[in-house]
Every structure is written in C-alpha cells, then in structure tokens.
C-alpha cells in the first residue's frame, strides 16, 4: 500500500517537465518592439500599428501578437525604455528613450543651476521692493513668489502664507478702482 502512494506522485513530475520545454520561435516582444522602432527611424516616433506590421512581417508570431505587443508597449513605457511622443496609453507614437548616462548627466547640471538661482530671486524682491510703492509691490511680490515657490523645497510655507495675504489685499484694492473705472468708462462712451 505504501508503494502505491509513492508511485502516484511520480508521473506528475514528468508532466511539469514537459510543460517547460516550450521554446519561442522569436525573441521577446520587448526586443522586437525595440527593433521595429529602430528600423523605422521616423522623426515623430513609431505608431503601434506600424510596430505590429513590422513584427508580423519579420517574425513568426502567434494569433495573439497584437495583444502581446500592446501589453509589452505599456510595460516598456512604465519601465522608461520607451518614450511616448503622441497619444495616451498603448496608442500613439513611441520612441526609444535615451540611455541612462545621457539622462543622468544633464539632470545633475540642471538641478545645480536651479538651486543657485532660486535663492537669489527670492532675496531680491524682499529687500528691494518692500520699501517701494506698496500696492504695486505687493502684487509683484505675490506673482514672483508663486513662480519661485515650486523651485524651492525648504521655504514654500512662508511664501504661500505671504502670497495669500497679498492676494486678499489685491482683491480689496482692485474692487474700488474697478468701480471708479466703470463710472469713468460709461461717460466716455456716451
């Protein structure tokens, strides 16, 4: 009886081995997509349809190739291997993203430049324009600070608080001149 129990799992193991013997007659879809984009060399990128045509004409793929291509395009977009030039999702046009070395070196330079310029811009408006004309200076400050705030990481809280006060002050000051300007305009038209 114990022998019959041992024999039943033995035939199940070879079935698993048979399932792993499958071999594809083509490279991976991601490799085929990259080859299709390289071969097309279009300025605006390659569309999904043109990629599908290229793959079907150059490789032996199954009947579900369109679905596999669409899914692998999405994966490549998420991984950053492809860059989408037009459209949304798997539709549109695609290019191969530039190599990591090319991306990293300009990225570091840009960050360094941003850090050096943002404190200078923030320091100048506070010192130079605060003693100047009050109503115009507050409007200019609020605009410039709101532009500079996304670049800064350390001081956005103080900038936001001041810009809110300035925007409230703007509304009060603007409402009075608008009423006057409206009264002035109506006699001119008549």
Curated annotation (Swiss-Prot):
SUPFAM superfamilies: Winged helix' DNA-binding domain. Disulfide bonds: none annotated. InterPro entries: H1/H5, Histone_H1/H5_H15, WH-like_DNA-bd_sf, WH_DNA-bd_sf. One of its GO terms (cellular component) is nucleus. Residues 1-29, 87-190 are annotated as: Disordered. The modification Phosphoserine is found at residues 23, 30, 146, 167. Keywords: Chromosome, DNA condensation, DNA-binding, Nucleus, Phosphoprotein. It holds the Pfam family Linker_histone. GO terms for molecular function: double-stranded DNA binding; nucleosomal DNA binding; structural constituent of chromatin. It comes from the Eukaryota. Histone H5 performs the same function as H1, being necessary for the condensation of nucleosome chains into higher order structures, and replaces histone H1 in certain cells. This is Histone H5. It comes from Gallus gallus (Chicken).
